[in-house]
Regions:
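Cys/His-coordinated zinc-finger cores
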Residues: 29-48
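Domain-level detector for long C-terminal conserved domains
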Residues: 2, 46-120, 124-568
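The −1 position to Zn-ligating cysteines in a subset of zinc-ribbon hairpins
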Residues: 5, 25, 34-35, 50
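Cys/His-rich Zn2+-binding "zinc-finger" mini-domains, especially FYVE domains
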Residues: 1-29
């Protein structure tokens, strides 16, 4: 990993930019690094605006408290500030639960296992689970892995294909940085975008020119990278749309794109929602989050942004508005405690830590594409149609060692019965692989099963426990104010202490999980072996640090995984 450059640079170009390595962190905020005392002193007039920012003070309070009013996420008397669940676009281009290794060979087939494997990601969203799985493979693995990746969203599929083509066609040190910024940064350096376009555009346009088929006809194209292959089966129209995500010139100016981005991520009408998210965080984390929301560029806090002037065409597509809700956050797709492992000196630079972690993982992922035997196939289908479409395309059914279904089994989507009936038959038989596993995620089940009586019954215990972790601080704010930030903080954290097992068991009984499984020759695992049943839930007798990691992650602890295996 290359060292980070000294943070002594200025946006107005009024000073010469230091090209030395950043080795000395600011001890005030731990957000930036310098090559030495001279540069730190020279940069202080600029850095003090961040280091002394009121948001970094322990006494900082949200605007609704300072202005002594009802927060906008509660008040519905003003049309502009009517509480809504979402502001911004409706696409989910960044994961909202942490990535996990789909194989976990050590705890399943065994660390020395080297037979071929087949994986299905039926509603993949982004590529985080693929990346996590590939980088977690034991170095001794010698088999071939076949991976089918599907999503119904055009933008998700196009971005995933572009990222993988970059990994196949550019050296790992270049590809890893390019994928990172295409994935998470609103703006890119011109040189990076041209490298990507030069690698990806001809790979698609040349084969389309040689095969002029009708718009609805499915075209399959395969690329090779040493012993790995990448293919996609898309209609001609869908292939053309992939190319539209890499235009020769930007569809939109930097100024207009920045305004569109800020209209979602920094909307005035949503300031109370932002303050509610910022308030619980470590003071320097607040500023790291604010900077990312402000400029939309995933870099260390002190890194220069001056080259990042081209709108990311996979996010600003055909002059469309910012495609994601204002709650979208790259951090939610990764495990916070893994991101925060010591990696560089600016220890409170939260998004800088994420940058370091992602760059390392993506570099490893790109390297392993060159050494493993992988065959990756991309599809754009509704999950409900996917099994039939795959069988038609291949002329046979494909059976899998792992089937990952995201949360399509939630009641608001396909539901558990239909999901299991569609994908359960695709799991390999016990005599082929007794460890074959189908993985369902339920994000909304406990909320859907909870009644007002449940909520009333659980609140006293939750609030009593929370006094230990989130005590009211009478020196800051008015504790008698029912909209006191500490009190609302406690209410937000109460989900972490809810009896979710009881609520989820209601769904298991009402939806007749066991009966469904029995009909299909499947059973729910008593002990999950791929991903913990409640991976984001607090354990018994948590420490203050464990509570803070869970609360600051932005997750509720209600996320429940169910693993199914062949029985009988």
């Amino acid at each position: 990993m290359q060292p980070f450059l000294c943070a002594n640079w200025r946006q107005d170009h009024s000073a010469t930019r230091c090209l030395g390595a950043g080795t000395k962190g600011c001890t005030g905020c731990h957000l930036v690094m310098y090559c030495g005392k001279d540069c730190q002193t020279a940069h202080w007039p600029v850095h003090k605006l961040d280091c002394k920012n009121p948001m970094r003070k322990a006494a900082w309070r949200p605007a609704w408290e300072v202005e002594n009013r009802v927060p906008h996420f509660i008040d519905n008397s003003d049309e502009e500030h009517t509480p809504v669940a979402m502001h911004g676009g409706s696409k989910y281009l960044w994961g909202n639960v942490p990535a996990f290794d789909l194989l976990q060979l050590k705890d399943n087939e065994g660390e020395d296992y080297s037979r071929d494997l087949s994986l299905l990601l039926a509603a993949s969203g982004d590529l985080r689970n693929l990346v996590k799985t590939i980088v977690s493979l034991p170095g001794s693995y010698r088999g071939r892995i076949h991976i089918d990746i599907n999503d119904r969203d055009e933008t998700v599929v196009a971005r995933n294909l572009v990222f993988l083509l970059v990994a196949f066609h550019l050296p790992p040190d270049v590809a890893s940085v390019a994928i990172l910024h295409l994935w998470y940064s609103a703006f890119l350096p011109e040189s990076l975008l041209q490298s990507v376009r030069g690698a990806v555009f001809p790979a698609i346009s040349e084969f389309l020119a040689a095969d002029p088929v009708q718009a609805a006809s499915v075209l399959q194209k395969m690329w090779s990278c040493r012993s790995s292959t990448l293919s996609a089966a898309l209609s001609r129209t869908e292939w053309d749309r992939v190319l539209s995500y890499l235009p020769e010139a930007p569809d939109i100016s930097y100024e207009k794109a920045a305004a569109l981005h800020e209209s979602i991520t920094l909307a005035h009408s949503r300031r109370d929602y932002r303050d509610r998210a910022l308030f619980p965080l470590h003071p320097s984390w607040r500023l790291s989050l604010w900077k990312f929301r402000s400029d939309g560029i995933l870099l260390p806090f002190g890194a220069s942004r001056e080259d990042f002037r081209v709108p990311n065409p996979t996010l600003f597509h055909n002059e469309h508005p910012w495609p994601m809700p204002d709650s979208a956050d790259p951090l939610q797709g990764w495990t916070l405690t893994e991101i925060l492992r010591p990696s560089y000196g600016a220890k409170h630079d939260l998004y800088g830590q994420l940058y370091v972690s992602l760059k390392r993982n993506l570099h490893s992922f790109c390297e392993r594409l060159h050494t493993l035997k992988l065959s990756i196939c991309l599809f754009k289908q509704d999950a409900m149609d996917l099994p039939d479409k795959l069988a038609t395309l291949r002329g046979r059914e494909t059976f899998y060692d792992r089937i990952e279904l995201a949360n399509i089994a939630d009641l608001g989507y396909l539901g558990p019965a239909k999901t299991l009936a569609l994908f359960g038959p695709l799991l390999k038989a016990r005599n082929e692989n007794p460890k074959a596993t189908l993985i369902m995620l339920f994000l909304n089940a406990t909320r859907e099963m909870s009644t007002p009586a449940d909520q009333l019954a659980s609140m006293p215990r939750a609030m009593e426990t929370l006094q230990r972790f989130l005590p009211m601080r009478p020196r800051h704010g008015d504790p008698k104010n029912k909209y006191n930030a500490e009190f609302l903080n406690q209410m937000s954290a109460a989900d972490l202490f809810t009896d979710n097992d009881t609520l989820f068991n209601r769904l298991v009984e009402r939806a007749r999980f066991r009966d469904m499984g029995r009909l299909l020759g499947l059973g729910m695992k008593i002990h999950n072996s791929i991903v913990a049943k409640w991976p984001l839930r607090l354990g018994d007798n948590p420490t203050q640090h464990e509570f803070e990691m869970a609360f600051w992650s932005g997750h509720t602890g209600c996320e429940r995984y169910v693993e199914w295996h062949r029985v009988g």
